């Protein structure tokens, strides 16, 4: 498939989405937060359907639009409930008026968490991710896997640990459930995938589960471990998609796992890069991905949340299977026709 995305709208949409995320992250008010969220989402709807001549891209954009609109409605309803219970939309004023025994406001928190869980594709609000990742241009998929997730996780931290830190007993188990479900489902669902972008979609769901595990603890160590994890995950994703964008032959991109067959024989440097990246994503020491998971598990075990740690370890073992399967295809399967080597300098530098 030939991806014709070099149009003037493309950078404008990317910048509009980033602007919305910056507004969302820096907001101290529910209304401003919602406006930033919608500015981000409107740009992402168009980016998802940028290859409008292809059925998969149009389907992905429509599915993302419908489900995102539903989640935004639930999130706005949660904001209205919180305003109704507290009389304010300012985070600081909300925090000053709350007590730890105000259970009624939990309904508002739940609705907002549902909306945010959709944005980071946490289970069970992940339905859009595989189709959108596969149907979007590869560079847009890279954007989806990195920037919106960082913004949404930052909002998770600001939202839960500023106005609602006193209500940790009400929202902690919600995050624990989202974390466990995401880690297990993402790891298991990725096993049967043949498309690299769908595999990364399910893999990202699993990785978000680890980041949520850090946030669910309710301590500074948990927040720090979550931030470290998502930072390392972003770097690994950038490297993986750089390799994916280099899989081009005669102006056509290839994105199936079988297209990596025997890659080491024709492209040894790219194969070595993928080896390091996939080992790191699998959490194999002494690479960065291992330390990312180590800090998460350390913070979880220190708070005696042993079941969460056991589920995380089990998910890591399951996920290692499909990462190692890709490495086996790269190094031990028969080689295919060589890919182009005239890549942009920026792509080579990012790798």
Model-found features: residue ranges?
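Alpha-helical transmembrane segments of multi-pass membrane proteins predominantly involved
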Residues: 1-351
């Amino acid at each position: 498939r030939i991806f014709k995305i070099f149009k003037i709208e493309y950078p404008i949409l990317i910048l509009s989405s980033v602007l919305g995320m910056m507004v969302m992250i820096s907001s101290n008010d529910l209304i401003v937060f919602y406006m930033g969220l919608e500015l981000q989402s409107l740009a992402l709807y168009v980016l998802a359907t940028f290859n409008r001549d292809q059925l998969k891209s149009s389907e992905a954009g429509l599915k993302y639009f419908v489900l995102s609109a539903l989640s935004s409605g639930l999130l706005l309803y949660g904001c209205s409930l919180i305003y109704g219970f507290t009389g304010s939309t300012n985070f600081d004023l909300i925090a000053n008026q709350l007590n730890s025994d105000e259970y009624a406001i939990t309904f508002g928190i739940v609705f907002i968490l549902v909306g945010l869980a959709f944005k980071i594709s946490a289970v069970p609000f992940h339905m859009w991710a595989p189709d959108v990742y596969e149907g979007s241009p590869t560079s847009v998929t890279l954007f989806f896997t990195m920037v919106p997730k960082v913004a949404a996780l930052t909002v998770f931290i600001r939202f839960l640990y500023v106005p609602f830190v006193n209500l940790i007993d009400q929202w902690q188990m919600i995050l624990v459930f989202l974390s466990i479900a995401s880690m297990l489902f993402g790891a298991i669902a990725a096993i049967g995938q043949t498309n690299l972008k769908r595999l990364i979609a399910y893999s990202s769901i699993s990785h978000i589960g680890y980041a949520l595990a850090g946030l669910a603890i309710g301590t500074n160590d948990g927040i720090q471990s979550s931030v470290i994890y998502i930072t390392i995950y972003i770097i690994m994703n950038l490297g993986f998609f750089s390799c994916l964008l280099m899989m081009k032959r005669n102006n056509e991109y290839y994105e199936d796992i079988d297209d990596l067959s025997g890659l080491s024989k024709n492209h040894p440097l790219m194969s070595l890069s993928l080896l390091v990246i996939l080992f790191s994503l699998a959490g194999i020491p002494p690479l960065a991905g291992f330390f990312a998971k180590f800090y998460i598990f350390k913070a979880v075990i220190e708070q005696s949340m042993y079941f969460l740690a056991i589920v995380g370890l089990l998910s890591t073992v399951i996920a290692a299977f499909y990462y190692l399967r890709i490495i086996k295809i790269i190094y031990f399967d028969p080689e295919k026709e060589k890919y182009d080597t005239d890549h942009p300098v920026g792509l080579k530098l990012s790798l």
